[in-house]
């Protein structure tokens, strides 16, 4: 858990912070299994690039969040107001050097970060945005396989059947059936084959529920949600629906006009990318702003990118950009963690170009990288692994933790992580991971298959000569077999001696 002393303003005294990993021995000597709260981690979607934003495919999903400001309804009622004039509501005084009058950071929910509101400095940035936001960090808002952020991470088949039983009753409330439809759409995207097969058997009935809800008009509370779910079906092919981008956009637009936050974000994406409608960047900004006003994390991050780089014919404004980036970082979660990563880059590079309003802070950068890594962002996981490996960002070197992060990322087929994991297996990690040249070669081949240059060279050298004989860490096959045959109690005892037993595994990394 990351803890601060709750200071306010831009000057903080950070307490000593501990980052916990419960490392348990595995039956495989060359692997460390961790027991943590990272079960929800999943590979993030990687999208292709476009001219102004990373391209978002039509099946990108958006997520409902509650409104945090009464200003959202006021803004939405001002239909004749230009989007550029609307944006002036966010920052009334462009020349202000602080956001204290624009937003009350103490009132923002920071439960996702387990931090008090004093973490993020609310001063405007002073740096070259083109330097801080490199091409890698300008990737699209990462999505997940989950449809709605307020859903559980997984659904059991029994829960799905129980929900259907309630929804199929004759005197069923519309909200009950709507809840089943939400679960069905999520289960269809899950990794459980039984869940997918069950939804496939009920897809026609579920689609009939949706169409009946929409045909009733705005006569029940969940009408906007039903419109959105039906739009998801037409836009992504859910419930085996034939994809129809024009119909999906029409339904998204109807839901957005009823103040549905995710639908507003989806309409903005459609207008920006031209999915089912003619491209209209001015209207896209209007809907991005509406979604951001409804506290949609992805929309807040998009607005930050627009102002940082001056995209879509909008004048570059670092003050407004930093406002949205701070909000996006405060509300970031496992579906939209990118704002954390971008803010970490700013703290890592510091204000090298203007008045020094955003000071260099490696400690805060590491905290933000680590939170984004816990949320599953691949770039952040790679950065955290390097920090533990090389002692960067004022972090103590810890090869075991570095190995854990590299291995987690290597399982997602990241070539750099696979190459690093190969080096760890080649050289070993203290007395926890024994050298294993064969396994090192396998991971190097996997990285080479992904066109990693160093891994390709390494594999070619292995084919020409016995590289492993030149290393000082090579162990004999007999010794390796002897180590692999250690009983589980012996492994636990060995890990305990190295202070990696569950009850004692609380190594500290000073971040202040």
Curated annotation (Swiss-Prot):
Keyword Repeat in record: yes
Cite the propeptide residues by number.
510-512
Entry function: Involved in chitin biosynthesis.
In the record, which residues receive a covalent lipid, type S-farnesyl cysteine?
Answer: 509
Membrane topology value: Lipid-anchor
Q: What is this protein called?
A: Chitin synthase regulatory factor 2
Mapped Sel1-like repeat ranges: 224-260, 261-296, 297-333, 337-377, 378-414, 415-452
The record, for InterPro entries, names:
Chitin_Synth_Reg (IPR051726), Sel1-like (IPR006597), TPR-like_helical_dom_sf (IPR011990)
Q: What does the UniProt keyword field contain? A: Lipoprotein, Membrane, Methylation, Prenylation, Repeat
Q: Where in the cell is it found?
A: Membrane
An example of a Gene Ontology cellular component annotation for this protein is: nucleus
- Modified residue annotations for Cysteine methyl ester: 509
Origin species, per record, is: Schizosaccharomyces pombe (strain 972 / ATCC 24843)
What taxonomic classification does the UniProt entry list for its organism? Eukaryota, Fungi, Dikarya, Ascomycota, Taphrinomycotina
The organism's superkingdom is given as Eukaryota
Q: Pfam families under this entry?
A: Sel1
């Amino acid at each position: 858990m990351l803890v601060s002393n709750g200071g306010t303003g831009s000057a903080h005294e950070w307490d000593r912070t501990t980052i916990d990993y419960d490392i348990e021995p595995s039956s495989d000597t060359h692997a460390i299994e961790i027991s943590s709260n990272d079960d929800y981690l999943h590979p993030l979607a990687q999208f292709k690039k476009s001219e102004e934003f990373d391209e978002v495919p039509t099946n990108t999903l958006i997520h409902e969040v509650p409104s945090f400001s009464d200003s959202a309804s006021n803004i939405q009622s001002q239909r004749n107001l230009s989007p550029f004039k609307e944006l002036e509501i966010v920052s009334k005084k462009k020349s202000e050097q602080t956001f204290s009058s624009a937003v009350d950071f103490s009132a923002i929910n920071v439960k996702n970060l387990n931090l008090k509101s004093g973490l993020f400095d609310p001063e405007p940035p002073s740096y070259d945005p083109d330097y801080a936001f490199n091409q890698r960090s300008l990737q699209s808002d990462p999505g997940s396989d989950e449809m709605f952020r307020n859903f559980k991470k997984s659904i059991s088949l029994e829960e799905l059947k129980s929900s259907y039983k309630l929804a199929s009753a004759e005197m069923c409330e519309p909200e009950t059936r709507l809840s089943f439809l939400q679960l069905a759409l999520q289960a269809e995207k899950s990794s459980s084959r039984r869940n997918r097969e069950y939804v496939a058997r009920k897809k026609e009935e579920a689609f009939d529920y949706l169409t009946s809800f929409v045909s009733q008009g705005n006569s029940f509370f969940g009408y906007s949600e039903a419109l959105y779910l039906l739009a998801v079906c037409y836009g992504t092919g859910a419930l085996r629906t034939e994809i129809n981008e024009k119909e999906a956009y029409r339904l998204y637009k109807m839901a957005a006009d009823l103040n549905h936050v995710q639908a507003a974000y989806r309409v903005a994406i459609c207008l920006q990318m031209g999915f089912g409608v003619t491209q209209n960047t001015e209207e896209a900004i209007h809907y991005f702003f509406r979604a951001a006003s409804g506290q949609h994390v992805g929309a807040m991050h998009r607005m930050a990118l627009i102002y940082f780089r001056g995209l879509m014919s909008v004048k570059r404004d670092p003050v407004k950009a930093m406002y949205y980036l701070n909000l996006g970082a405060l509300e970031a979660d496992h579906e939209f963690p990118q704002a954390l990563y971008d803010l970490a880059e700013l703290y890592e590079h510091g204000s090298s170009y203007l008045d020094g309003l955003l000071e260099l802070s490696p400690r805060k950068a590491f905290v933000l990288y680590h939170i984004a890594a816990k949320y599953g962002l691949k770039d952040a996981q790679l950065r955290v692994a390097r920090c533990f490996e090389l002692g960067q960002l004022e972090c103590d070197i810890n090869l075991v933790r570095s190995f854990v992060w590299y291995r987690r990322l290597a399982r997602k087929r990241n070539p750099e992580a696979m190459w690093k994991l190969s080096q760890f297996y080649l050289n070993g990690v203290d007395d926890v991971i024994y050298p294993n040249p064969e396994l090192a070669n396998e991971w190097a081949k996997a990285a080479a298959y992904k066109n990693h240059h160093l891994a390709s060279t390494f594999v070619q050298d292995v084919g020409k000569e016995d590289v492993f004989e030149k290393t000082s860490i090579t162990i004999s096959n007999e010794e390796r077999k002897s180590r692999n045959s250690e009983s589980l109690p012996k492994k636990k005892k060995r890990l305990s001696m190295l202070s990696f037993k569950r009850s004692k595994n609380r190594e500290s990394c000073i971040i202040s």
